[in-house]
From Swiss-Prot:
The chain crosses the membrane at residues 942-962. PANTHER family: PROTEIN SIDEKICK (PTHR44170), PROTOGENIN (PTHR44170:SF47). Residues 413-507, 509-605, 610-709, 716-809, 814-909 form the Fibronectin type-III domain. The keyword Cell division does not apply. This is Protogenin.
Length: 1187
């Protein structure tokens, strides 16, 4: 670089020599540095040399600056002949002037001056230990870790001693990290002792306190331990080219394997990265691309047992230029624009220097973002300009030269400029024509700007050459302005005229003061106000007028106060009453506009122990944000639980309350509109009552200048897009408005949960990018987002609101109630319940199972099930093995912990065949065998004997009931009526048929029939027999037997028959897949006789079976275990101990047809019943179904 700079300087010198005869062209040699000072760390009394060598056209003068001020040279500090600064003895003791600071050298020649980069001189120091090693006990074979931390400049070198001797680090199991951490893996008895760290710098050496390591003998039994990270990586911020170490120490049995990855799935740089010790990640020569989130993962070999820890690496980078300023040549009265852009982490700040001195934006010279604009160039602007970019990592500078070309035939400057005030906003400016070449003047330009303050904008008005006076209006009242005139001709512009300053007249105030209302007692209101800003005061305020009244009274009371006052106490007021107050200010010209009425309620007379009103202060930060600050009275003894904040725009609805803690003394209100007046009230509260409130008004400033008030705001950002990133963060992206050409300053993001009640939870974030990751959100919560744009002191409206929900949290617990049932010789059913927690979302279950031999080898078989399922089949199990089963729940965010291991014993084939099946094993039955399930032969024998005894007892009870029923029917039958609704709605399941009684007429009207219960006579054959029908009275003759199909009964005819009552008993026999047919017989009976109705059922339940589904490829599992349908389960639960048989039934095949036809027609259709089989043919049944 120095050689290239010399060549460039030589080339420019040659070009300057060639151009020397040409009029109006100057030759010059640019000034540049060959060597610049660098950062230095020195000990006290050391000698230091700060280099500085500049090249350019001689003579060159070098001066030194310290912290922006000139270095005072003496015998100890002076400049060498080559421009370097020499300090013979560095001082820095307390009580003396320290030499520490930032140094810069300034090189100057006749063309200008340049400033070097900053050099930071620091003294070598070392502090006391911030963290010292602690004593610990470690089991033999475990991991021991000691740490110490000390602040030093430069960073201290840390070594370790054991028993006051240097610890040898040649063993692989001992690692000493440069960060001050000592790791000992596979601890042995000989490692026991006293450890301490030693920190050494260039100036001193410090030793820490000793820590004892006790080694406990290891037990013979080494149970399985899940991996655990006992020392994970910490967030690190590093400078460019430094070395970073991310620590990761894990324990477990078997010993876990440590691996590293990046959270963004980018590959880790293998050239600058290596593993230090037993899992620590060391990154050498850190670069910006190394920044990110690093994940340490500790995994038990051969298993899915792992744990992770992560940390963020932030890399800071010094500034570097992306765009450099270029040298310019401009004529007098022209405009020069220098561009400069730099990047770095954090983002660098851009500033401009002219001949080594910082430039402030004012008048003709403006700085827009990182650009420098010089308007109305004058000869004094000919200089060397430098763009300086600096951040916490350093500073860089880039230079450019502005050459001002002067015309030889230009006119002289206008003279005799004078100004006269016309009004509060207008000044008359007059001047004389130039004395030289005035006949060539074609126009004049009038320049004016405010005389007070910095960063004032200069305005320009161009007028013709036919006049020498001009009235400038649109000025602010009671303000000083500076004016000058420039004459123009075809070949260029004249020099500036002399400057003249003039003051505008006063005017009435443009607005009223912002008032604050508080109460010290139930009968007073303290009114205080701030001075009106000079911009709106428009002169000196001489009077204030206070007006107040009760809200229920139209009578107004008025007080006038001197302009020097800033508060007034209203006394003798009514307690617990609302008062309205307003204020007006006046200058010597007259009264301004009064403020709007501000309301305030006086405290209740009983609120003597309520918190006093806080002292409130409001301050606008910008045109959309205000800061609310308050201070509670120190004499207030009332307890304060918190504060309530309310705010509203004048004439709008109030927002709040915003609940704040008792420790809060400041709050920022964002998202306001520019040039609006807002009313804020604040009060303290406790468990008993609310305190006295403080009210105050504030006005937000405008975002545009007076001349730009008609400029419309920019359109809002478009295409706002939200995507959930984690359970606590959402990624936002949006587009810049297509019709906005202005430079975007930043964006404001508004974020809050949907349906938010507390306005203090609204989050406002700032960024200059078109994307942002919003963090710190609640899981599984819907948020609303909006974005607004800020450009050139203008704010856009809020974008349309976008709603998005954060992801749920990963399951925090394992599935519960894990049960295992052996349903076949080689098949087991696993069932479980979802993890505890109402907010837990599960999308998938992972089932791990393995035999003991496979488990020891770390080989698990894996099954996955959807989150809606809570059972699975384990197939192809090997007899004689004990299987271990555990389950974990997971969702799209992550996987939860596994459940406790449940053991399942699969008995040998010969043993399992002698036992009854199925065998049900669950975690709730485990006692001495720790989730081990086993049903031996004796247990199964006992179960079988118990079931047989129960069946025998039930059979005896049924026989007794049948015998007694026969006896009752013979003596005195009782009327029974069956509900037709029950018959129609049971749909084969008639468990409640003996609960309700109805008359036979009711049954006939509903086209349903009840059959007589057939007693258990031995001569009745269920498979077939004669046409003889027998009821409880004996055989029924053909004359008295009339068979009617239920579907074809004539109910009207039945009603007209003689009033007789028939005994009806229903007989049924159910088999899966068949339909019951019942017929009714007419039996002679008295009108008062009725029969009992009983419908016993015996339904054989199907065994459990597996539906076809896609299974796990690892095990060939069918994929799911399906229950019976709901109807079948219902039927199987409604069983009777006594099956009944009769010959009055059709065959199974015929019953199936009738069943299918009847049920498919309608849910309300009754079942088809027939009385006896011989009289009914399949043709008749088929005909009946068709009808």
């Amino acid at each position: 670089m120095p050689a290239a700079s010399r060549c460039m300087a030589l080339l420019r010198a040659l070009l300057g020599a060639l151009l020397l005869p040409m009029p109006g062209v100057w030759c010059f040699s640019e000034l540049f540095f060959v060597r610049e000072p660098q950062d230095v760390t020195a000990s006290r009394k050391d000698a230091v040399v700060l280099d500085c060598q500049a090249r350019g056209e001689a003579p060159i003068t070098v001066t030194w600056l310290k912290n922006g001020g000139k270095v005072s040279e003496n015998e100890r500090i002076y400049t060498l002949s080559n421009g370097s600064l020499y300090i013979s003895e560095v001082e820095g003791r307390k009580g003396e002037q320290s030499d520490e600071g930032f140094y810069q050298c300034l090189a100057l020649n006749k063309y200008g001056a340049i400033l070097s980069q900053k050099s930071h001189l620091t003294l070598a120091t070392i502090s006391a230990f911030e963290v010292q090693p602690l004593s610990t006990e470690v089991q033999e074979g475990g991991v021991a870790r000691f740490t110490c931390k000390i602040a030093a400049n430069p960073p201290a070198v840390v070594t370790w001693e054991v028993n006051r001797t240097t610890l040898p680090l040649s063993m692989d199991r001992i690692t000493a990290l440069p960060t001050g951490v000592l790791q000992i893996y596979g601890v042995e008895q000989k490692d026991a002792g006293n450890y301490r760290c030693v920190a050494t710098t260039i100036t001193s050496r410090r030793k820490s306190a000793e820590a004892t390591l006790n080694v406990i003998p290891a037990s013979d039994l080494k149970p399985f331990h899940k991996p655990a990270i006992i020392a994970g990586p910490q967030n690190v911020t590093a400078s460019l080219h430094q070395t970073v170490i991310l620590e990761c120490v894990a324990t477990g049995n078997p010993k876990p394997i440590i691996s590293w990855s990046r959270l963004d799935h980018k590959s880790i740089d293998v050239f600058n990265t290596r593993v230090l010790g037993n899992g620590n990640l060391m990154i050498s020569d850190v670069k910006v691309q190394h920044a990110g989130v690093y994940v340490c993962r500790a995994t038990i070999p051969g298993t899915r047992n792992f744990t992770v820890a992560m940390a963020t690496l932030t890399v800071l980078a010094p500034p570097s230029f992306v765009e450099w300023p270029e040298s310019l040549t401009r004529p007098r009265a022209g405009t020069a624009r220098f561009a400069c852009q730099a990047e770095g982490i954090p983002a660098p700040k851009i500033s401009w220097l002219k001949n080594g001195r910082r430039i402030h934006s004012n008048g003709r010279i403006k700085m827009y973002n990182s650009k420098l604009v010089i308007n109305q160039i004058i000869p004094e602007d000919d200089a060397i300009y430098q763009c300086m970019a600096e951040n916490s990592q350093g500073s860089v500078l880039s230079r450019a030269r502005l050459t001002v070309v002067m015309s030889e035939d230009r006119p002289s400057a206008p003279y005799n400029v004078h100004a006269e005030t016309m009004s509060s906003s207008a000044i008359l400016l007059a001047w004389e024509r130039p004395l030289y070449n005035s006949d060539k003047v074609i126009a004049y330009s009038v320049h004016y700007m405010k005389a007070e303050g910095l960063n004032n904008e200069e305005y320009q008005v161009v007028i013709g050459n036919d006049t020498t006076h001009y009235i400038i209006d649109d000025l602010e009242p009671a303000s000083n302005y500076t004016f000058y005139i420039v004459a123009y001709m075809p070949l260029g512009a004249s020099q500036m005229s002399d400057h003249v300053t003039q003051h505008t007249l006063e005017d009435v105030p443009l607005r009223a003061p912002e008032i604050s209302l508080t109460s010290r007692s139930p009968t007073d209101i303290l009114i205080s106000w701030l001075p009106i800003p000079a911009k709106y005061r428009r002169g000196q305020v001489v009077l204030y007028r206070l007006s107040f009244r009760l809200s229920t009274d139209s009578k107004i009371q008025v007080l006038e106060l001197p302009g020097t006052s800033d508060e007034y106490l209203l006394e003798g007021l009514r307690p617990d009453s609302v008062y309205l107050v307003r204020i007006t200010a006046a200058t010597r010209i007259g009264w301004g506009e009064a403020s709007l009425w501000t309301s305030h309620r006086t405290p209740k007379a009983t609120s003597v122990k309520a918190p006093k009103s806080p002292e409130l202060r409001l301050e606008p930060i910008n045109c959309t944000t205000i800061t609310v600050q308050w201070q509670q009275d120190s004499d207030d003894t009332a307890a304060i639980q918190g504060y309530k904040l309310y705010y509203k725009e004048e004439g709008q609805q109030e927002n709040g309350p915003i609940l704040l803690d008792a420790s809060d003394l400041e709050y920022t209100v964002s998202g306001l509109d520019p040039r609006r007046k807002y009313h804020v009230r604040l009060l303290a509260y406790n468990n008993m009552e609310e305190g006295y409130q403080a009210d105050q008004t504030v006005s937000t400033p405008g975002c545009v200048s007076v001349r730009d008030r008609m400029v419309p705001p920019p359109p809002p950002p478009h295409h706002l897009y939200a995507k959930a990133n984690t359970s606590s963060s959402i990624y936002l992206h949006w587009g810049k408005p297509a019709f906005t050409s202005a430079q975007v300053i930043n964006y404001t993001i508004r974020c809050n949960p949907v349906g938010l009640q507390n306005a203090s939870l609204v989050l406002y974030l700032q960024t200059s990018e078109t994307h942002m990751l919003v963090q710190g959100l609640e899981p599984k919560t819907m948020y609303e987002f909006a974005v607004r744009l800020h450009v050139d002191q203008l704010s856009s409206p809020w974008s349309p609101v976008v709603y998005h929900t954060t992801l749920p949290e990963a399951p925090s617990g394992p599935p519960v109630g894990v049960k295992v049932t052996l349903i076949e010789d080689d098949t087991a059913l696993v069932s479980w319940k979802p993890p505890d927690g109402p907010e837990t979302v599960v999308t998938r279950y992972t089932i791990l199972y393995a035999s003991r031999k496979s488990w020891i080898a770390g080989e698990w078989q894996v099954l996955h099930r959807e989150g809606a399922m809570t059972m699975a089949l384990l197939e192809n199990l090997v007899a004689g093995n004990v299987y271990l089963v555990k389950i974990a729940a997971s969702n799209e965010v992550g996987e939860g912990p596994f459940s406790n291991v449940v053991e399942l014993a699969v008995l040998p084939k010969e043993t399992s065949e002698s036992n009854q099946r199925p065998k049900r094993l669950d975690s709730g039955d485990s006692t001495a065998y720790s989730d081990y399930y086993h049903l031996d032969q004796k247990s199964m024998t006992g179960i079988v004997v118990g079931v047989c005894i129960a069946l025998t007892c039930i059979l005896i009870c049924i026989l007794i009931l049948i015998y007694r029923s026969k006896a009752r029917k013979t003596s005195a039958p009782k009327p029974v009526q069956q509900s037709t609704d029950q018959l129609s709605h049971t749909n084969i399941s008639l468990a409640s048929a003996n609960e309700v009684e109805k008359s036979i007429d009711g049954i006939a009207e509903n086209a349903e029939s009840l059959l007589p219960m057939i007693v258990g006579n031995s001569f009745i054959d269920a498979k077939g027999g004669s046409d003889l029908i027998i009821n409880s009275y004996g055989p029924v003759t053909k004359a008295n037997c009339k068979k009617r199909w239920l579907f074809f009964q004539d109910t009207k005819k039945m009603k007209t028959e003689e009033p007789q009552r028939r005994f009806v008993q229903a007989v049924c026999l159910y088999q899966p897949g068949t339909t019951v047919l019942i017929s009714e017989d007419d039996s002679p009976s008295s009108p008062g006789q009725q029969s009992n109705f009983q419908v016993p059922f015996s339904i054989a339940a199907d065994t459990e079976h597996s539906a076809n589904s896609e299974g796990s490829h690892e095990t060939g599992d069918s994929g799911r275990f399906s229950h019976e349908s709901n109807d079948e389960l219902h039927l199987s639960s409604v069983t009777s101990a006594t099956p009944c048989a009769t010959s009055h039934f059709v065959s199974s095949d015929l019953g199936k047809n009738v069943m299918n036809s009847t049920i498919s027609d309608s849910k309300e259709s009754p079942l088809l019943f027939a009385t006896d089989q011989p009289a009914t043919s399949p043709l008749q049944i088929h005909s009946a179904v068709q009808n």
